[in-house]
């Protein structure tokens, strides 16, 4: 059955068509505005690219790094793309190799050495002069009597030498008996013995090869249980006797309640004359201290409130001293050197006479010229120096400013107290400690000499812990010698000195010595350090390398950093999306037998049932062909089909 539908075309008027076009344009504009508004509403604070390809495509199209744009522009030519890719990454690697060299140089903290010559008034250094005799022998003879007898007997046994050439047999026998009693109590643990060994010995360090036949004398040191002993040996018998005598002399001093009363601190009895810059010195210009071996010591120009200054060089513009060097009352077995000992050092620094001093000969005028030299080091990462010693893990036992020697000696004394239970007499006493005395500390000598071996080989770590100061001032000394006074003038010179000091100089030339200390020149040298590779230099070198290889700026570095951050962010986002997709459950599927239920079976078709269907036709009016004509836009009209 067919039904024919007749459609009647109706022509749309022109005005209606224009209105319709205008309405469609307005609707299109509204749709675009709504879409733009929705896009702005959905725009976030931080937007990332959707893929790696999009990220690198955007970077290569917009970066200011030279060569990166070629990776995109040459993508249709695979050979060029490969060439520029290899060249780009090779250049990148070379640039960062240069960066590594620059960073390594920067973190090595190199320095430049600066040498300056300064011309100014020079502050005169402190000068310490010692008598080389710790005590007057007449004042300590009673305390040293037992030690002297033991030493005399030892010299007789070893070298057949008697200190007293005229001695009765009874006195000798009595002395020998007393010595034997003393040896059994004190010295038998540390006896002097002659030893001769023919086998060679190898010494550690830089010591020259020594045959053991040269090691002739020494003394034994044992621990408290006498289970461990060793020989403290010397190649010279004089050195061995003096060291052994000094060891027991220290024990005697430690037992004495007060040794200050024995000090001969009379300035005039040692210093006959003192002048600085042609002006006489007075008591306000020196300080006094006592050394157990070097005796009474006088330090000139150590008062910080009134320091001497020198404007001109020369012998007449320095310090001139006339000192007494007679040995009428010296300890014979301890004071083996005649003269005086002098040392030049900075103010507020202890005078370590055995390290930096030298001896002045009697009957000689010693002229010492000085040249000042200051070294200033950079601290922090540039060198292992310290400003004031506050960052050094060693307690300063001296009442002075920090020096390397102060730290080293304090370190040894602290280890001495910890290891041996007592302090060494030559160094300051730590709080709560007492000086070593073998009546209380039987094996302190064994402990001390064992500790000395560890100290010198840096097993204690004192040389590693004690760092050098960042500013050090040293004086380069040059000495000249001449006989004083001359043979034709010595009579009247010594006569005047005897009348002036009320002391009869009997030995004349061997009784006095003259010392002149002055600046050789009024210029002094300063050695300084400055950083050779600063942060500014590093940034400049990095910029030069970046410009050389890529011709870019700091903003290009920011672009590269942005690329790295975007790459990391995209990696995290994609990984998170992949993880979420694995967590979403799959859609449910009906069971395989769901349609087996008889209730869901379709009805069988009845062949006798008639076929019925309904056809609905929707008849609309066909548009006019004039409606296909485009609307006017921008003042133009396009004519369509009629």
Swiss-Prot record:
It comes from Pelodiscus sinensis (Chinese softshell turtle). Residues 170-209, 587-608 are annotated as: Disordered. One of its GO terms (cellular component) is extracellular exosome. It catalyses: Na(+)(in) = Na(+)(out). Originally identified and characterized by its inhibition by the diuretic drug amiloride. Pfam families: ASC (PF00858). It is a multi-pass membrane protein. This is Epithelial sodium channel subunit alpha. Residues 178-197 have a biased composition (Basic residues). Signal peptide: none annotated. It comes from the Eukaryota. Residues 1-81, 575-642 are cytoplasmic. GO terms for biological process: cellular response to acidic pH; intracellular sodium ion homeostasis; multicellular organismal-level water homeostasis; sodium ion import across plasma membrane; sodium ion transmembrane transport. The chain crosses the membrane at residues 82-102, 554-574. Heterotrimer; disulfide-linked and containing an alpha/SCNN1A, a beta/SCNN1B and a gamma/SCNN1G subunit. It is found in: Apical cell membrane; Cell projection, Cilium; Cytoplasmic granule; Cytoplasm. NCBIfam families: ENaC (TIGR00859). Disulfide bonds join 130-297, 222-229, 274-281, 385-470, 407-447, 407-466, 411-462, 420-447, 420-470, 422-436. GO terms for molecular function: ligand-gated sodium channel activity; WW domain binding. Residues 103-553 are extracellular. Its main location: membrane. Keywords: Cell membrane, Cell projection, Cilium, Cytoplasm, Cytoplasmic vesicle, Disulfide bond, Flagellum, Ion channel, Ion transport, Membrane, Sodium, Sodium channel, Sodium transport, Transmembrane, Transmembrane helix, Transport. Belongs to the amiloride-sensitive sodium channel (TC 1.A.6) family. SCNN1A subfamily. This is one of the three pore-forming subunits of the heterotrimeric epithelial sodium channel (ENaC), a critical regulator of sodium balance and fluid homeostasis. ENaC operates in epithelial tissues, where it mediates the electrodiffusion of sodium ions from extracellular fluid through the apical membrane of cells, with water following osmotically.
């Amino acid at each position: 059955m067919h039904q024919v539908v007749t459609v009647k075309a109706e022509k749309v008027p022109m005005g209606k068509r224009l209105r319709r076009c205008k309405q469609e344009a307005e609707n299109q504009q509204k749709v675009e505005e709504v879409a733009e508004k929705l896009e702005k509403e959905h725009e976030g604070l931080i937007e990332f690219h959707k893929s790696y390809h999009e990220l690198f495509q955007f970077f290569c199209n917009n970066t200011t790094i030279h060569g990166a744009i070629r990776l995109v522009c040459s993508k249709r030519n695979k050979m060029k793309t490969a060439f520029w890719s290899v060249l780009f990454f090779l250049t990148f690697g070379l640039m960062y190799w240069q960066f590594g060299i620059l960073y390594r140089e920067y973190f090595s903290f190199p320095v430049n050495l600066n040498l300056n010559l300064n011309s100014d008034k020079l502050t005169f250094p402190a000068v310490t002069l010692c008598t080389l005799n710790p005590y007057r022998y007449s004042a300590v003879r009673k305390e040293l009597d037992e030690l002297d007898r033991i030493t005399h007997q030892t010299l007789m046994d070893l070298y057949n030498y008697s200190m007293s050439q005229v001695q009765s047999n009874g006195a000798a026998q009595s002395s020998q008996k007393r010595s034997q009693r003393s040896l059994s109590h004190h010295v038998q643990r540390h006896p002097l013995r002659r030893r001769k060994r023919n086998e060679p010995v190898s010494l550690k360090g830089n010591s020259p090869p020594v045959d053991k036949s040269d090691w002739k004398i020494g003394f034994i040191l044992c621990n408290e249980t006498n289970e461990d002993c060793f020989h403290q040996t010397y190649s010279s018998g004089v050195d061995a006797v003096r060291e052994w005598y000094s060891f027991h002399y220290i024990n005697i001093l430690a037992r004495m309640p007060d040794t200050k009363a024995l000090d001969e601190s009379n300035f005039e009895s040692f210093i006959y004359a003192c002048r600085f810059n042609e002006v006489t010195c007075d008591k306000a210009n020196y300080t006094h201290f006592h050394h157990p071996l070097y005796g009474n010591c006088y330090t000139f120009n150590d008062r910080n409130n009134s320091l001497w200054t020198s404007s001109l060089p020369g012998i007449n513009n320095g310090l001139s001293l006339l000192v007494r060097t007679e040995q009428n009352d010296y300890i014979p077995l301890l004071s083996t050197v005649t003269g005086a000992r002098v040392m030049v050092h900075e103010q507020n620094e202890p005078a370590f006479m055995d390290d930096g001093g030298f001896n002045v000969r009697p009957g000689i005028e010693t002229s010492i010229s000085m040249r000042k030299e200051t070294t200033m080091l950079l601290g922090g990462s540039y060198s292992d120096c310290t400003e004031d010693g506050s960052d050094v893990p060693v307690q300063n036992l001296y009442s002075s400013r920090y020096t390397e020697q102060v730290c080293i000696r304090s370190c040894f004394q602290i280890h001495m107290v910890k290891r041996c239970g007592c302090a060494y007499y030559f160094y300051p006493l730590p709080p709560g400690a007492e000086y070593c005395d073998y009546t209380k500390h039987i094996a302190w000598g064994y402990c001390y000499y064992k500790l000395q071996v560890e100290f010198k080989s840096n097993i204690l770590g004192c040389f590693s812990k004690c760092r050098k100061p960042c500013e050090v001032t040293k004086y380069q000394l040059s000495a000249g010698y001449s006989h004083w006074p001359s043979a034709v003038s010595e009579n009247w010179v010594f006569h005047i000195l005897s009348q002036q000091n009320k002391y009869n100089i009997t030995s004349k030339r061997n009784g006095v010595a003259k010392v002149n200390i002055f600046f050789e020149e009024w210029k002094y040298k300063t050695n300084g350090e400055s950083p050779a590779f600063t942060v500014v230099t590093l940034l400049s070198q990095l910029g030069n390398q970046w410009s050389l290889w890529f011709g870019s700026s700091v903003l290009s570095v920011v672009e590269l950093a942005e690329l790295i951050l975007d790459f990391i962010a995209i990696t995290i986002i994609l990984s998170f999306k992949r993880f979420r997709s694995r967590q979403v459950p799959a859609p449910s599927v009906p069971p395989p037998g769901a349609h087996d239920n008889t209730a869901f079976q379709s009805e069988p078709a009845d062949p006798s049932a008639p076929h019925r269907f309904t056809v609905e036709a929707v008849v609309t009016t066909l548009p006019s062909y004039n409606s296909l004509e485009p609307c006017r836009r921008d003042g133009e009209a396009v004519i369509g089909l009629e």
